[in-house]
């Protein structure tokens, strides 16, 4: 067995190599003057079982194309089996047609991964697990809840775990149960044209004097977390921490979250966070346990 580290790994390939005691080969990659990607696998992999690590955070389209190129090259070079470890799977939120005529982007991406020869697909915290049914091979879903719960307990003595919508409640419950913390949820709705988020429903929860941790799968523009943070403080919260498995933080999201009083940000290395102000958890151990 061999690990192939792609063009975007955030160190997960190196960590897996150490955890699993498997040799690591890094792909050679560069960008041509016209913007196209060059990929080369600089090692013999014939008859090998290959673990390919490639996340697809920003720039998503570049990293996806390189994932497809690397995967098919691995099969062309005679690998016996190919497992693609894609810690963050881009386009996962476009899993249906919200408006007539829209592309179902995740469907296309998963079809391509099937066609280029991926036998097993490993994804960390997909937006909706059922969307992965478009992939034709074996699926493995990684939930790094234990690592996140442990980090929360390390920095907050008595946390209250809050899901920013009903869909995130199961995640919040599992993390809360790991550390015997109370939990609840609020309900939001999003305008599909403007993207604006507003609170639709808030159960009768007591947050007075609580250190609240809002946990979601993805924090992108931060609109949902901004609204949830305002609500938490209006209900008497002492502090608010925002945590996500995939901490994208696009378009000034970090600054917006700080402005409304988010004290601490927690993410993982599924995304290239590269910010010393953000607590970043390595999900490699959770991935290794799934293999």
Swiss-Prot record:
Biological process according to GO: 5-phosphoribose 1-diphosphate biosynthetic process; purine nucleotide biosynthetic process
UniProtKB keywords: ATP-binding, Cytoplasm, Kinase, Magnesium, Metal-binding, Nucleotide biosynthesis, Nucleotide-binding, Transferase
Keyword Kinase: yes
Subunit structure: Homodimer.
Pathway connected to this protein: Metabolic intermediate biosynthesis; 5-phospho-alpha-D-ribose 1-diphosphate biosynthesis; 5-phospho-alpha-D-ribose 1-diphosphate from D-ribose 5-phosphate (route I): step 1/1
GO function terms (MF aspect): ATP binding; kinase activity; magnesium ion binding; ribose phosphate diphosphokinase activity
Enzyme Commission identifier(s): 2.7.6.1
Organism, scientific name: Saccharolobus solfataricus (strain ATCC 35092 / DSM 1617 / JCM 11322 / P2) (Sulfolobus solfataricus)
Positions annotated to bind ATP: 34-36, 93-94
Active-site residues from the entry: 188
Protein's name in the database: Ribose-phosphate pyrophosphokinase
Amino-acid positions noted as binding Mg(2+) 1 in the UniProt annotation, renumbered to this chain: 127
């Amino acid at each position: 067995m061999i690990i192939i580290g792609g063009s975007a790994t955030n160190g997960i390939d190196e960590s897996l190599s150490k955890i699993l005691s498997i040799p690591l080969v890094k792909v050679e990659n560069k960008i041509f003057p016209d913007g196209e990607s060059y990929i080369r696998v600089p090692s013999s992999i014939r008859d090998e079982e290959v673990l390919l690590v490639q996340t697809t955070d920003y720039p998503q389209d570049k990293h996806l194309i390189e994932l497809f190129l690397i995967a098919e090259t691995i099969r062309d070079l005679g690998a016996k089996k190919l497992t693609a470890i894609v810690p963050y799977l881009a386009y996962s939120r476009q899993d249906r047609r919200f408006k007539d005529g829209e592309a179902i982007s995740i469907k296309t991406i998963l079809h391509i991964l099937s066609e280029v020869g991926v036998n097993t697909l490993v994804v960390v915290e997909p937006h909706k697990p059922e969307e992965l049914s478009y992939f034709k091979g074996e699926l493995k879903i990684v939930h790094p809840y234990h690592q996140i719960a442990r980090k929360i307990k390390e920095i907050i003595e008595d946390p209250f775990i809050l899901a920013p919508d009903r869909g995130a409640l199961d995640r919040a419950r599992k993390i809360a149960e790991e550390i015997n913390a109370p939990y609840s949820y609020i309900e939001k709705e999003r305008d599909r044209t403007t993207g604006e988020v507003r609170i639709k429903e808030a159960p009768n929860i007591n947050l007075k004097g609580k250190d609240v941790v809002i946990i979601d799968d993805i924090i992108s523009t931060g609109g949902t977390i901004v609204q949830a943070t305002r609500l938490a403080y209006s209900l008497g919260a002492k502090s608010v921490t925002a945590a996500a498995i995939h901490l994208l933080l696009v378009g000034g999201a970090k600054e917006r979250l700080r402005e409304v009083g988010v004290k601490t940000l927690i993410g993982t290395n599924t995304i290239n966070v590269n910010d010393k102000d953000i607590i970043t958890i390595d999900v490699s151990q959770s991935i290794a346990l799934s293999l």
